[in-house]
Curated annotation (Swiss-Prot):
This is 3,4-dihydroxy-2-butanone 4-phosphate synthase. Its EC number is 4.1.99.12. SUPFAM superfamilies: YrdC/RibB. Transmembrane segments: none annotated. GO terms for cellular component: cytosol. It holds the Pfam family DHBP_synthase. Keywords: Lyase, Magnesium, Manganese, Metal-binding, Riboflavin biosynthesis. It comes from Tolumonas auensis (strain DSM 9187 / NBRC 110442 / TA 4). Mg(2+) 1 binds at E38. The record marks H136, E174 as: Essential for catalytic activity. Pathway: Cofactor biosynthesis; riboflavin biosynthesis; 2-hydroxy-3-oxobutyl phosphate from D-ribulose 5-phosphate: step 1/1. Its cofactor is Mg(2+); Mn(2+). One of its GO terms (molecular function) is magnesium ion binding.
Length: 217
């Protein structure tokens, strides 16, 4: 990864801190993974703070596959089965069946409806019957241990929410270029500057968590 493109956003520690501050304020952040992995950048929001306007931006500017990152505990609480029994995807992305709020939505496609579905899924005391399946929101199961276990956007999302002191659930979607191709780091930086959002890479988060663990130990 050409780290020089990230230099305007600070050093790795500063990039993580800026992302945490943005999430606490209800704003979005951009997370890029390793070049030898997906080599993509995701727009990420806190599930509890995301607004319909932000959802509309995500639908408009990104791939349209809006994913809700959930912990294994929440997946069990909602009794969400995995999308397939045997996952053969290259990066072992943990898709469950898709969901829709059982109440308070129309077709489930609009930005407001997707926010309603997300709020329903992360509500305290939520149960399986609060959701219909299938739907227009794609839950993702994060691996326990976060990015120190799997260096994926799903785990990065959960780790960021925990570090920010928020509910450990987030919403992500892959950023695309205007021509429909996937945005790489230069395009992610351009998007960040356009929308005044911080950028960090998963490597930054791994270093931050590792350093914190050393300090705590």
């Amino acid at each position: 990864m050409n780290q020089s493109l990230l230099t305007p956003f600070g050093n790795p520690f500063q990039r993580v801190e800026q992302a945490l501050s943005a999430l606490q304020q209800g704003n979005g952040v951009l997370v890029v993974d390793d070049e030898d992995r997906e080599n993509e950048g995701d727009l990420i929001f806190s599930a509890e703070k995301m607004t319909p306007q932000q959802m509309a931006l995500m639908i408009r500017e990104c791939s349209g596959i809006v994913c809700l990152c959930l912990t294994e505990e929440r997946i069990r609480q909602l009794a969400l089965p995995m999308m397939v029994e045997h996952n053969t995807s290259a990066n072992q992305t943990g898709f469950t069946v898709t969901i829709e709020a059982a109440r308070g939505v129309t077709t489930g496609v609009s930005a407001q409806d997707r926010i309603t579905t997300i709020r329903t899924a992360i509500a305290d005391g939520a149960v399986a019957s609060d959701l219909n399946r299938p739907g227009h929101v794609f839950p993702l199961r994060a691996r326990a241990g976060g990015v120190l276990t799997r260096r994926g956007h799903t785990e990065a999302t959960i780790d960021l929410m925990k570090l920010a002191g928020l509910k450990p659930y987030g919403v992500l979607c892959e950023v695309q270029n205007e021509d429909g191709s996937m945005a790489r780091l230069p395009g992610i930086v351009e998007f960040a500057n356009k929308h005044n959002m911080p950028v960090l890479c998963i490597e930054d988060l791994v270093a931050y968590l590792t350093e914190n663990a050393k300090a705590a130990g």
